[in-house]
Regions:
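N-terminal intrinsically disordered, low-complexity segments enriched in P/E/S/T
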Residues: 1-232, 236-259
Length: 259
């Protein structure tokens, strides 16, 4: 099928939609529910911008992310469930985890980092994995400061990583030396080709010669999208549209116009 194809990697999922998409899925499949994204609703716990750092370090200490604002970074990245279809993209602002680690006097052999939420939830990750991906302690999502019922709140985000590791309401970070570096869960192969029709209508009629625009977003967590393919005859033939230059850390936002 002939047509015009366009793509970029721009755009974000509005915060209310992020909660609607992940609010229930995250409970069972990803990290804890992101209640702090919902305007007017409170999250559980007593999280603030103060985070306690401990583990296998010479001296425990606390940091206030507000005092590290000059080191903050802004990134746009995908948040994607490992065992479900939901995913979204957000513009986040936060302090690099590396900046906090640099402040710690590590003991020999430290290879693991675990961020704990106010409810005690935490997922161990290889320290080098997080540093290589420029993990952020995020305090702003899509221009909105994160809040808990007691004040400011922080979340752990990192590119090309499933959302179960995006711990909410972070209050403690442990840097530890483990005998075995923890494995990192990747996306379930069943969900690599995530397809969801977000908008549809019954009884639509398109007349010959009318211009029709199809649009959507695509993500293959940890791998760049190489092409979007279309079929208008039940899969007998396919039109391949390359997405040259697309990177793995963001979704592909595409449009295909035909008549």
């Amino acid at each position: 099928k002939e047509g015009a194809f366009f793509f970029n990697q721009d755009g974000v999922t509005p915060n209310d939609e992020l909660f609607n998409v992940f609010g229930t899925a995250i409970t069972s499949m990803c990290s804890k529910p992101a209640n702090e994204l919902v305007v007017g609703e409170s999250a559980e716990g007593a999280a603030t911008y103060y985070i306690n750092i401990g583990g296998n370090i010479k001296e425990n200490f606390s940091v206030n992310l507000e005092d590290m604002e000059e080191e903050s970074e802004e990134q746009t990245m995908v948040c994607s469930c490992a065992t479900g279809a939901p995913f979204g993209q957000a513009a986040v602002v936060g302090v690099p985890l590396a900046a906090v680690v640099d402040m710690a006097n590590l003991e020999d052999g430290v290879n693991t980092v675990t961020a704990y939420g106010a409810d005690g939830f935490g997922q161990a990750l290889p320290l080098q994995y997080c540093l290589d991906r420029d993990a952020l302690l995020v305090y702003e999502v899509n221009g909105e400061k994160l809040k808990s019922e007691t004040g400011p709140s922080a979340q752990l985000w990192m590119p090309e990583t499933v959302a179960r590791y995006f711990t909410r309401n972070v209050v403690d970070i442990k840097l530890t030396a483990e005998e075995q570096v923890p494995d990192v869960q990747s996306v379930d192969p069943t969900y690599r080709n995530k397809i969801e029709i977000m908008n549809s209508a019954d009884g639509c009629v398109f007349f010959a010669g009318n211009s029709i625009t199809f649009e959507g977003v695509a993500d293959d967590l940890g791998s760049p999208i190489e092409a979007i393919e279309f079929s208008f005859d039940g899969g007998e033939t396919w039109t391949e549209c390359p997405t040259e230059g697309a990177t793995a850390d963001k979704w592909v936002n595409w449009q295909f116009e035909t008549s």
